[in-house]
Amino acid sequence: MILKKEYLRERAVAYARKYALVRNPLFYTFEGIGGNCTNFVSQSVLAGSCVMNFIPIYGWFYLSSNRRAPAWTGVQFFYNFMVNNLDVGPYGSVVPIEQAQIGDVIQLQNNDDVYYHTLIITEIRDGEILICANSVDSLDRPLSTYEYKSLRVIHIEGVRYDTRYVVDCFESLYDPPLPPITPPSEQTPSNEEVPPPNGESIEEQTPSETGEEE
């Protein structure tokens, strides 16, 4: 059964503030191959929702750098998923900037009319929107300090989830346990991944195959 639940904005903000200037070892970092900003925002939204969507190609999930949905790391793909998602996972809509809330997502457009950068709102103070981002790393940076042609606000309205798979992921995301220290002689490649709950296979991708990585 598919039900709806609240998007926990404070958790998304707490995660964004913790990892704006450092990297969570659970996730690959895409700097140098397009940018890490949408990857970072996806992590933050996951912290507030704890539900991925494992539909191949069109879902929103991360298993490894080579097993992830385009929407996890691509600016336009992220937008397409969030505003069109009718299945499990977070979902939202575009709203005026005046209706923005903490935990919502902002995407910036350049002079070529391309949306190129993804940010997450962490505070609204006296009318000033503060954001966290990667590539360039920013912690509670005023939105007014960015240069852009236009922007869009993706308001996360809620989260759909399958009652068979209810997980509170926040603590394991926010403060992941350290892996055990293994002597070099005993180390083996750690490329095995847990399959998605629905059992569907996920085709491997190279980090650059999912389009714009920002």
Q: What is the predicted role of each segment?
A:
Residues 1-73:
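N-terminal capping segments
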Residues 12-14, 129, 151:
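A broad, low-specificity signal marking well-ordered, structured residues that form hydrophobic/aromatic
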Residues 31-33, 58, 73, 88-91, ...:
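Feature targets compositionally biased, intrinsically disordered low-complexity regions
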Residues 54-57, 118, 143:
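Short, solvent-exposed loop/turn and secondary-structure capping segments
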Residues 61-134:
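...with weaker cross-activation on analogous glycine-rich loops/strands in unrelated enzymes
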Residues 129, 141-143:
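Short acidic, gly/pro-rich beta-turn/loop elements at beta-sheet edges
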Residues 138:
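Contiguous ligand/interfacial binding patches
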